[in-house]
């Protein structure tokens, strides 16, 4: 088209489109969009305070006892309080008494537990890595799990094996294997006590503040336990505290109904210990010739009187555990992370404290505080912090919360631990899988817990007074 023909044509187009009509953008109707879901970062902070909010001591609503009196279960509003008299019979009798009392509960323990075990197995072995190792054949999956259970149980001290056998005797009727039929077989009951060693799905964290940073002058320790809560948060129906009463070797475990190993516990000398999964960058899971580290934690708490002794006990045995993990350990005067590394690819077993040099990629400026996540942190260890979102972001969130020199009261400590709104895309510390937030207060010698209920993780949960632990 020649120029003299193009100009009039362009003018005509502009006239038709309104470009020369004198209308402005104000004359145009605004397009309709859905309301934005973006929120300012400040909306992800809770802005609450626990000042003047005491822990709640729940009353017993009902009690259930074994016929021999070895086990008593007190049902509270939000958890079960279990007492096992370890002097009331042999180990087999203790396990059997616990199971006998559990069968009396209105929560249908056997069905609830089996459902949870199979949900967890399906979740863990649904990943691409697991499928590459075991394939998609259900029979192969249960065969693998049974092999792990048998191997780890066989390596336990006799008294723990006898407890497990006594426990299973009340459910199995002699049945073995894995069949989802509403009844716990021997193998299914044994798996219950070995879940972390066999299935390994955790994302936990913790921090401790020594007396120089607290108003009371005594240590405060917090441990967050996270797990797959199951369908409709079914696992929360089994929130539980177990008191293993055995004179000077007594231990308290904060756990789920039925478990006899220890994932989080404290003894009557004030030693607190909690297991956190780590894993390996190079090595696949192999329990051949290995033993359970959650039962090793129980044994350490039953025999050790200081945090250092407990940590050294565990690091000496690290090569005998099936996979890498941390154990967060405190007493009134000291705090450690036992970095239980069992393979040369990922480092060495060691005790980390506040003065231990850290990985070059880590920053920490919270004096007199020791933090732990699902990775080793000591200099020279394999780096599973960098590039692992839930580890590095949690570490950084703790650093920011506890940096500076503010002296913390128990109430302020609780406020900091719940400073994030729960369950958002920006939540780093209290994820949707939080089972409980547990605090050991070395001023009052008490444990306080905020248990997650069926409704999920609360922004400002009630802390329950679980009583004196030493």
Feature-to-residue mapping (PLM):
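Gram-positive cell-envelope targeting signals
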Residues: 1-24
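Basic side chains
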Residues: 2-4, 223, 298, 394, ...
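Residue-level detector of functional hotspots within protein domains
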Residues: 5, 150, 252, 257, ...
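A periodicity- and composition-biased signal for non-globular, repetitive helical segments
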Residues: 9-11, 229, 400
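Short amphipathic alpha-helical segments, especially helix-boundary/capping motifs
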Residues: 13, 137-142, 284-288
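Flexible loop/turn segments at secondary-structure boundaries
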Residues: 16, 215-216, 228-230, 280-283, ...
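C-terminus-biased signal that marks the final domain/tail of proteins
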Residues: 19-204, 301-470
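Internal mixed beta-strand/loop scaffold within catalytic domains of large alpha/beta enzymes
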Residues: 188-296, 438
């Amino acid at each position: 088209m020649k120029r003299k023909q193009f100009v009039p044509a362009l003018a005509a187009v502009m006239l038709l489109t309104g470009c020369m009509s004198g209308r402005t953008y104000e004359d145009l109707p605004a397009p309709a969009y859905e309301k934005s879901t973006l929120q300012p970062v400040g909306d992800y902070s809770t802005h609450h305070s626990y000042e003047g909010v005491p822990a709640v001591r729940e009353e017993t609503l009902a009690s259930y006892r074994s016929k021999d009196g070895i086990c008593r279960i007190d049902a509270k509003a939000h958890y079960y309080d279990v007492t096992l008299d370890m002097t009331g019979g042999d180990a087999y009798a203790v396990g059997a008494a616990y199971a006998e009392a559990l069968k009396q509960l209105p929560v249908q323990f056997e069905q609830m537990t089996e459902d949870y075990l199979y949900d967890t197995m399906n979740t863990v072995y649904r990943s691409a890595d697991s499928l590459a190792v075991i394939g998609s054949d259900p029979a192969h999956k249960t065969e693998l799990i049974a092999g792990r259970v048998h191997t780890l149980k066989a390596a336990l001290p006799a008294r723990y094996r006898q407890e497990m056998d006594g426990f299973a005797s009340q459910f199995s009727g002699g049945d073995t294997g894995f069949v989802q039929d509403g009844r716990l077989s021997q193998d299914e009951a044994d798996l219950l006590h070995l879940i972390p060693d066999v299935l390994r799905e955790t994302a936990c964290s913790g921090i401790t503040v020594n007396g120089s940073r607290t108003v009371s002058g005594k240590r405060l320790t917090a441990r967050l336990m996270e797990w797959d809560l199951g369908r409709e948060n079914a696992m929360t129906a089994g929130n539980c505290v177990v008191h293993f009463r055995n004179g000077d070797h007594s231990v308290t475990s904060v756990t789920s109904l039925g478990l006899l190993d220890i994932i989080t516990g404290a003894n009557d000398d004030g030693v607190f210990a909690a297991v956190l999964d780590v894993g390996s960058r190079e090595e696949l899971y192999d329990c051949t010739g290995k033993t359970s580290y959650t039962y090793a934690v129980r044994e350490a708490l039953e025999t050790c009187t200081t945090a250092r002794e407990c940590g050294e006990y565990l690091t000496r045995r690290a090569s005998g555990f099936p996979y890498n993990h941390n154990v967060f350990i405190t007493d009134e005067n000291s705090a450690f992370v036992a970095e239980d590394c069992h393979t040369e690819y990922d480092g060495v077993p060691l005790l980390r404290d506040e003065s231990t040099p850290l990985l070059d990629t880590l920053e920490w400026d919270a004096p007199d505080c020791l933090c732990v996540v699902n990775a080793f942190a000591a200099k020279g260890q394999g780096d599973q912090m960098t590039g692992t979102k839930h580890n590095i972001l949690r570490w950084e969130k703790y650093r920011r919360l506890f940096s500076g020199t503010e002296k913390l009261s128990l109430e302020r400590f609780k406020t900091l631990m719940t400073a994030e709104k729960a369950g958002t895309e920006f939540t780093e510390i209290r994820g949707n899988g939080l089972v409980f937030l547990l605090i050991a207060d070395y001023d009052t010698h008490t444990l306080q817990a905020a248990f997650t209920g069926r409704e999920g993780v609360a922004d400002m949960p009630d802390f329950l007074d679980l009583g004196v632990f030493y």
